[in-house]
């Protein structure tokens, strides 16, 4: 696997979480937020999230899909990793294939990160940036979508998309969806939920708008969705001396019909946490008291979840599995992941991993359908040799990220017994 996993962002957001006790049942309809759909048949209440923003792998519960640079041509080769054995192979069924160039069945004319989106019926939807002529300033970057089966055979060939998607993807098993944000000069955002057709008879790859919102300046989507809509956080700036910090004010649900419902309200020193991966949930953390509470998304009511040391500040990176929450904090300028179980004592994860010569905590990157975790185990550095375009033999040092699979309980104990996935270097 190519090294694509950069440093998980650990800059302090001074996220100050929302009041855990506020119960709000009214629905506030805001005149500047409107939803509209050009796809009457789209059932947005059945959407499930397929990937998170920035995810560098795609999972169907048993398989990890990834790409590597084609050794002897441009483009990338699609690979799979068995999440029960750790073994890696090219997604190619051609007998005798050496998996080197565009003749390989796993080859993609791809020049940017790829999203591999597994459907429940076994189809794989591939969305990726494509090579093309130099773009004019302000023009959309090239992108394509194609459909394959689990053997790698092409069901629908690469079809151009009107613009290059980014962020999370969703599906109702009929189409795939993604969010497209267009920022305005006043800081507000026009947000479209774009639907990509998967039925060849209806025009595979055809893009349309399934929903549209005009969001005010200080209302930000989290990309996590429920049956009713997208979770969002309303925030504001405040000053602490000469420092401008972000203060959370409301946890909201931007509903599919365009209305916005307030789930809970914030007090000073509190912040909302909507886990990046795993179960759809919301938590409230009070940095002054160290109290973590879980919020009921339907009523806004809260229940105590865990107690942490005072003075911690939430930062990015979190996962929820049942009654277990794994999240990252900053304390005295250092990043510290914690394992929290409802009603139990918090456990600081002390395992360190090396990235580019720097140590940092072992981070949870994703949650499998069976509740196991994908964990960043640090970098593997090695030498690689190849012949360049002039015929010269080149040797250089490179690295790729080691990934492990473990249960939440194994992670709590330092992930020493995790399954290490085979690297591309060993493949």
Language-model features, listed with the residues they occupy:
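Repeated scaffold domains used in trafficking and secretory/extracellular systems
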Residues: 49-59, 100-118, 162-173, 214-227, ...
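Residue-level signature of beta-propeller blades and closely related beta-rich strand-turn architectures
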Residues: 70, 130-132, 182, 236-237, ...
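Bacterial N-terminal signal peptides that target proteins for export
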Residues: 1-9
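Surface-exposed loop/turn elements that mediate protein-protein interactions on large endomembrane-trafficking
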Residues: 29-48, 75-101, 135-160, 185-214, ...
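C-terminal motif of bacterial Sec signal peptides marking the signal peptidase cleavage site
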Residues: 16-19
């Amino acid at each position: 696997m190519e090294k694509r996993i950069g440093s998980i962002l650990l800059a302090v957001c001074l996220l100050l979480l929302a009041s855990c006790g506020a119960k709000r049942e009214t629905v506030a309809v805001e005149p500047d937020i409107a939803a509209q759909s050009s796809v009457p048949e789209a059932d947005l209440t059945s959407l499930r999230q397929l990937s998170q923003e920035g995810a560098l792998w795609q999972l169907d519960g048993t398989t990890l899909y990834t790409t590597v640079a084609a050794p002897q041509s441009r483009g990338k080769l699609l690979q799979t990793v068995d999440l029960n054995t750790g073994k890696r192979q090219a997604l190619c069924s051609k007998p005798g294939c050496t998996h080197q160039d565009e003749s390989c069945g796993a080859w993609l004319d791809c020049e940017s990160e790829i999203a591999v989106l597994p459907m429940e019926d076994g189809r794989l939807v591939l969305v990726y940036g494509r090579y093309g002529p130099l773009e004019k300033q302000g023009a959309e970057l090239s992108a394509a979508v194609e459909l394959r089966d689990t053997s790698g055979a092409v069901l629908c060939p690469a079809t151009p998309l009107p613009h290059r998607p980014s962020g999370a993807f969703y599906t109702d098993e009929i189409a795939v969806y993604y969010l497209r944000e267009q920022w305005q000069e006043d800081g507000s955002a026009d947000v479209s939920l774009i639907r990509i057709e998967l039925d060849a008879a209806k025009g595979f790859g055809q893009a349309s708008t399934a929903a549209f919102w005009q969001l005010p300046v200080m209302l930000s989507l989290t990309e996590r969705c429920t049956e009713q809509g997208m979770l969002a956080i309303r925030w504001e700036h405040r000053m602490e001396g000469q420092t401008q910090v972000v203060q959370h004010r409301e946890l909201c649900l931007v509903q599919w019909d365009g209305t916005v419902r307030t789930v809970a309200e914030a007090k000073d020193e509190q912040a909302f946490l909507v886990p990046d991966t795993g179960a759809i949930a919301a938590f409230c953390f009070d940095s002054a008291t160290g109290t973590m509470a879980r919020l009921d998304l339907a009523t806004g009511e809260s229940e105590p979840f865990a107690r942490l040391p005072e003075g911690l500040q939430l930062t990015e990176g979190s996962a929820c599995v049942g009654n277990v929450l794994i999240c990252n904090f900053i304390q005295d300028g250092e990043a510290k992941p914690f394992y929290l179980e409802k009603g139990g004592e918090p456990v600081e994860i002390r395992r360190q991993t090396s990235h580019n010569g720097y140590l940092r905590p072992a981070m949870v990157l994703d949650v499998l359908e069976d509740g196991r975790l994908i964990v960043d185990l640090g970098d593997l550095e090695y030498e690689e040799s190849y012949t360049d375009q002039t015929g010269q033999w080149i040797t250089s040092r490179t690295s790729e990220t080691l990934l492990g699979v473990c249960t939440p309980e194994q992670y709590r104990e330092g992930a020493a017994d995790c399954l290490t996935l085979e690297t591309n270097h060993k493949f």
